Amino acid sequence: MKAREPRLGLTIGLVLLISLFGTASMAFSGLQGEYELMDGEPSLHESGKVILFEFADFYCPHCHMFEHVVVTKLQQEFGDKFESRMIGFPVMPGKLPTVFEMYNQAVTMGKGQKMKEILFQFIHNQDIHNFDKTIRTLVLKEVGLDRIEFEAGLASGKPFQTLGKNKKWGERIKVTQTPTVVLDGNIRIKNLNFDNLKVVIQSILDRDRKS
């Protein structure tokens, strides 16, 4: 009997493990559209809302277009059931990290969305790439932030630390290009057209209603 107990325990453990993975698979089996469930990444899902994490580079024209067209349409489609969060992830060579730090600081001051819009406009519509103090002052007027408080935040080094954490996250999940989109922290989307994202997001919301 004693010789069989380890085997019995192993068998029970395997059954439980299979059951656990089966349950996890069933949780996503109802989703529609093209997506990839990322192994080992925790879900950051909030019931009744889908969060789109976009690993993006402000200097990337594809990121600018994705934000301007696809994210805007998704926000109009789903309203408060959808949230977009940009994760600064530099990939364009020869660019300073200043804009990413500016964005991170604006997020802490409650103006991340507006800062994101203005930075994309300055870079892609006005062809401004050097964000020294003079240019930052113009940006801050557009965004509506106090210059002294903002500059103090930049000087603290915290926005740069946030950028480092974002880069580590992106490297961990093997982000190699921008934009890279992850829904709710663990659902990777490679087909970034509006129709596919709409289908996947809607199916997540439908799953919430049924649960």
For each feature predicted by the language model, list its residue ranges.
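Structural microenvironment flanking redox-active thiols in thiol-disulfide oxidoreductases
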Residues: 77-108, 113-140
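N-terminal secretory signal peptides that target proteins for export/translocation
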Residues: 1-6
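Extracytoplasmic/secreted envelope proteins and their assembly/folding machinery
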Residues: 68-75, 99-103, 116, 133, ...
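C-terminal cap of thioredoxin/glutaredoxin-like
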Residues: 28, 57, 141-211
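Solvent-exposed, acidic/flexible segments
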Residues: 48-49, 63-67, 92-99, 108, ...
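Sec/Tat-exported extracytoplasmic proteins
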Residues: 59, 70, 74-78, 106-110, ...
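Extracytoplasmic thiol/disulfide redox context detector
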Residues: 7-93, 167, 171-172, 206-211
